[in-house]
Amino acid sequence: MLAAVILSILAVVIGQIAVTTIKHGLGLRVVGSVEFPIVVLTFITYTLLPLFAIFVAIDMFNGESSSNTMKITLLRPVSRFGVFSAKVLNLALFIVGNLLFVMLLSLLVGFIFNPASASYMGIVKVILSYGLTFLPVFVFALIVVLLSNVIQGGLAVFFLSILVFIGFNFMGIVFSSYSSFFITSMFDWYTLWISESINVFKIFRQILIMSGCGIMLFTTGYYLFDRKDI
């Protein structure tokens, strides 16, 4: 958790340093106070955020299994579904907390360095963008949860999750016509909501795809967790 906070702060600080350097070095205003959080979001969504989600998911399932703390948890008067749901909920709360922290920090930094460009609608777009990013990242995290209940070793799950992430991004580019079926291609789906013209059909289609994938991954993950010999 501490590592996530430190790296998130570094991402925001480095981003602002880059923007300030370009502004003073070339005389160009790259982004304003409300555009800066969107730039930061684009960066962390494809780098730090999924990486943090992978680490947390592995720690919750493979980590507890290897340290035998899972057995202690299951000895309590609670069903396996309750344990699994609690772990998934904690994973979801971690993603929400990380997004909220980065959003507030990047907004603060943006206001400090570019106070004149702040606007109410800009802030609304930032909040909407960060909120919408939760769904695709959470669905990807459920893939890691599924892998954690299939493979025993945490290191193997980590590398496989990274390969899945890279593979989905690669296939989303190569097979652009079918990119909607690769969850990582929807990490930036918030742009559909904040653009000048809103494509309602595409938004609805992606909501259905992510919801369907999320339900199937959660159900399959729980089935494997329930059958798992701890």
Where are these predicted regions, by residue range?
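Transmembrane helix segments
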Residues: L10-T21, V150-Y190
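Transmembrane helix-loop junction
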Residues: G63, R76, L107, F111, ...
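Helix-loop-helix units of permease transmembrane domains in multi-pass membrane transporters
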Residues: M60-L93
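Membrane-helix interface segments
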Residues: S79-F81, S85, G122, G153-F158
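Secretory targeting signals
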Residues: A3-F55, S85-V150, W193-G212
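Junction motif at the cytosolic side of a transmembrane helix
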Residues: G212-I230
